[in-house]
């Protein structure tokens, strides 16, 4: 499957207009924003976990990073409330779910293969003083990339 896979082209997506698509796990639905591949894919997706839903244990060969948009995301490494940025590099594994339900914005298979930096952080705590009405936080920076978050 290829969806918005030509990264030389500008794409604007109204996520509220996208239908929720069921994942292979009951209670876990997604809105696909970009995708190259089938179930294991380079992808950017909004994922919704119904209360009490879980995904089976799996590894992230290409890494995973996500932002918890609402609710509390959980796995064996911790509980991550809304506003948390989580970075799981290649080779990490977990069993994700949510007792109360949650929605996350997730990017898969977009890491450098040598990246092994795993962490999570509260995005709001990282925000600097606003400039021209915009506050920005650097969530991750290394020789390969810089990940930022801006709040209006």
Where are these regions (language model features)?
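Exposed loop/turn and edge beta-strand positions of beta-sandwich/beta-sheet ligand-binding modules
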Residues: 27, 43, 62, 67, ...
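A short, N-terminal "cap"/entry segment at the start of jelly-roll beta-barrel domains
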Residues: 1-39, 106-149
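Conserved hydrophobic/aromatic beta-strand scaffold that supports enzyme active sites
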Residues: 30-32, 44-48, 65, 85-87, ...
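Glycine- and acidic-residue-biased ligand/ion/polar-headgroup-sensing regions
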Residues: 50-53, 60-75, 152
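Short acidic-glycine-tyrosine-enriched beta hairpin
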Residues: 74-94
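A short hydrophobic beta-strand segment most commonly corresponding to one strand
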Residues: 65, 87, 100-116
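Short histidine-centered beta-strand/loop micro-motifs
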Residues: 45-46, 55-60, 77-78, 96-98
């Amino acid at each position: 499957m290829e969806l918005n896979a030509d990264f030389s082209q500008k794409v604007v997506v109204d996520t509220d207009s996208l239908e929720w698509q069921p994942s292979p796990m009951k209670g876990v639905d997604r809105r696909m924003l970009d995708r190259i591949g089938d179930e294991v894919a380079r992808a950017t997706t909004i994922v919704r976990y119904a209360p009490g839903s879980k995904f089976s244990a799996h590894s992230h060969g290409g890494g995973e990073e996500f932002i918890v948009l609402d609710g509390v995301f959980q796995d064996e490494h911790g509980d991550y409330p809304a506003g948390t940025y989580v970075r799981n590099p290649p080779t990490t594994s977990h069993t994700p779910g949510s007792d109360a339900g949650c929605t996350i914005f997730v990017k898969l298979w977009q890491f450098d293969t040598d990246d092994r930096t795993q962490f999570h952080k509260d995005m709001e705590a990282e925000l600097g003083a606003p400039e021209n009405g915009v506050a920005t936080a650097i969530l991750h920076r290394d020789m390969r990339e810089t990940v930022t978050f801006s709040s209006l």
